[in-house]
Amino acid sequence: MYKYGRETDMKKLLILITTILMCIVLAACANEAPAGEDTEGEDTHYAVEDIEAGTGLGSFTSEDLDGNEVTEAIFADKDVTILNVWATFCGPCIEEMPELAALAEELPDNAQVIGVVIDAPPAGTQDGTAVDLWGGNADNIDLAKEICGETGVKYTNILASESVSKAFESVEAVPTTFILDRSGNTICKPFLGADVDGYKKAVEDYLAGL
């Protein structure tokens, strides 16, 4: 009876450990950094779910994975942009990338997909949001290139410079996807989690109204 009791206790312990590990895995793509506050204690952080249509992301300057300069002017190239914020450590982000790559090839000429690698700051970056909040480092640039190659992604991916991180400070978990107009303004609430069909419908609905 004693032996049976010990085995039962061990099984319960294993179940508990497994449950805890599953919770950790499910939360792995979350940024655990606290919401930003100003010096007077007033909350100045806007959660991504509070962003409404018409919200501008502001200006930024950064590089793509190949070192080419990228600014917010990239949005003006098309009527609508699917902007996918992801991280190299995020399984769900990587899983949806083949679908995003396929969607990018299917979109009409006046629409595009752009990625933001939130944990890959430009080379030489020692600190800042991408490093401090997302555990990023420049080594992730090569990892991001590898992931893009393996998933068939050919669209532009932007590195997380400090101004890019500021533009996307509302993002607390990835993937988070914004649908933007030519001016870099949101045309609908952001998508939290992978939803390629949802992105596609949002683009189609917007273009149909132009």
Question: What is the predicted role of each segment?
Answer:
Residues 176, 181-210:
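Thiol-/selenol-based redox modules, centered on thioredoxin-like
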Residues 30-59, 76, 139-146:
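N-proximal helix/coil linker or "cap" segments that precede and/or mark the start of modular domains
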Residues 1-9:
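Short, Lys/Arg-enriched N-terminal segments with co-localized hydrophobic residues
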Residues 79-81, 86-89, 120, 173:
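Short pre-active-site segment immediately N-terminal to redox-active cysteine/selenocysteine motifs
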Residues 59-81, 105:
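A short beta-strand-turn-helix
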